[in-house]
Amino acid sequence: MTAPTDPQLHLDQVMSRLTGPGGRFELVEEPVLGTRMPVMKNRGRSVGELLTTSLRWGDRDYLVTADRRMSYTEHAAAVAALATALREDYGVRKGDRVAILAANTPEWVVAFWATQVLGAISVGLNGWWVPREVEYGLTHSRPTVVVADAKRAETLAAVGTDLPVLTMEEDLPALFARYAGSPMPHTDVDEDDPAAILYTSGTSGRPKGALHSQRNILAVVDYHRFSDAVVGEFSGRPVDPAVPSPLRYLLTSPLFHIASLHNLVIPRLATGGAVVMHQGGFDVDAVLRLVERERVTNWGAVPTMASRLVEHDDLDKYDLSSLTSFSLASAPSSVAFKERLREKVPFARNALVDSYGLTECSTAIAVATAPELEQFPGTLGRPIITVSMEIRDPYGEWLPDGVEGEVCVRSPFVMLGYWEDEAATAAAIAPGRWLRTGDYGLVENGRLRLTGRRSDLILRGGENVYPTEIEQCLDEHPEVLECAVIGTPHEDLGQEVAAVVVLRPGAAATEAELREYAADRLSYFKVPTRWRITTDLLPRNATGKMVRRDITV
């Protein structure tokens, strides 16, 4: 059969074949927590089962660092040993929590899978938390045991917890040896049983624990399998699910977030691909050396990392020809930034992808392909498979295309709720399992365009001002590296618009110049009236999101 000359038509036909009756990813409508929605017919029911089936990938690389390699066989043996130790020595049972507090390391991944085969709940604590925040996380999640690296074990000592703490450097190797050869534990779970707790970034308050189910995580795995299959069919190289994937994914974001855990480490175990893990702070040259050595094919980066690539003065000294997919995620980026990225970074020119998602949704809500970013700049693509998306007004009513409102979504990816927080769950999940994202946007040509966070909205004299619009405008100025726009109190207007602008090295733009630049491109009430020009980078959290509450003018 000859493929259509229209790429979009070809893509639609490929997706229809894969998801139609009898297709590998056939879609059916079934009840999920009391609400009917599209789901994949041929799906798994237990996250732990993925570990058992991964044994077929044998001695292939699963986890790779700068100085270590762990095959699928070695990984499964370590998981079986640790799971047995957790069950026999620490009494971990189905539904118990096992907290993981560490930087990115293979042992983090082993601890996650050991928890899963026991039917317990993996709690990914933020490795950047200070003692006060760690204490909150422990009190909130009430784990049976904590697995930590040496540095975070010191933090736990400062907290004074009486929980058992297993260190990755000493305790885990001893347990691997003691329980070597143990059979893999198996625990029966239901599809909607909880599997993991990951904490929200907490950019506007205390972190909440998003509770993800077996269904949520397995749906993410199937989404990535589906995406791989679509690419294979579209390019004329169909994917055989019985053959291990040749793809090698670079992991640069923390494992305690969905980008690295749900959307990389877990699905790649299911497909037989390799996870190449950068450890330590983000160093461009160290990362690029790893890409070159390991022939990395796919990399999902936060915009702050991509910005370091743009500023690098000698990318050509590295052989980066293996990279065929480069995606942005976890934080917004402007059209101007994407243009600079494509111009400066060779592997981003034809492979750049952007997406929109949040912890509560387990994965992306919408994805924009490279052609879409070119044809529809400023948008974030269309909803991914099984995601229903609506724009709603403050009363929860549907709004038509082109009208701005709150982005609301429903899918098998949406979390069960917030761990032990019924009020927050009720506020976030509307009847019919519709998640209120808290983000404002609109739909253009079937594609999502975000306008800002509801919590970031500036109310100036009766006018709604979205910081994102102003930030993206200022970001286009050639001397601006990054910027933040916030609202500050004003006696008459309620709030006024203020901007903190970080200049590029050697730049000398003045407040007057930037004010004039903004005034030429924005309505008068959107032009900042207060400015702070600096060379100090803006505060960001572990996923690269700007922490507005820490910004002052």
From Swiss-Prot:
Entry superkingdom: Bacteria
Keyword flag Nucleotide-binding: yes
Reaction equation(s) it catalyzes: cholate + ATP + CoA = choloyl-CoA + AMP + diphosphate; deoxycholate + ATP + CoA = deoxycholoyl-CoA + AMP + diphosphate; chenodeoxycholate + ATP + CoA = chenodeoxycholoyl-CoA + AMP + diphosphate
Transmembrane segment boundaries: none
Known EC number: 6.2.1.-
Keywords: ATP-binding, Ligase, Lipid metabolism, Nucleotide-binding, Steroid metabolism
Induction and repression of expression: Up-regulated on cholate.
Cystines in this chain: none
PROSITE patterns reported in the protein's UniProt record: AMP_BINDING
SUPFAM superfamilies: Acetyl-CoA synthetase-like
Pathways per UniProt: Steroid metabolism
GO molecular function, one term: ATP binding
GO terms under biological process: fatty acid metabolic process; steroid metabolic process
UniProt keyword ATP-binding present: yes
Family (UniProt): Belongs to the ATP-dependent AMP-binding enzyme family.
Its job: Involved in cholate catabolism. Catalyzes the transformation of cholate to cholyl-CoA, thus initiating degradation of the C5 cholate side chain. Can also catalyze the ATP-dependent formation of CoA thioesters of deoxycholate and chenodeoxycholate.
Listed name of the protein: Steroid-24-oyl-CoA synthetase
Gene that this polypeptide is encoded by: casG
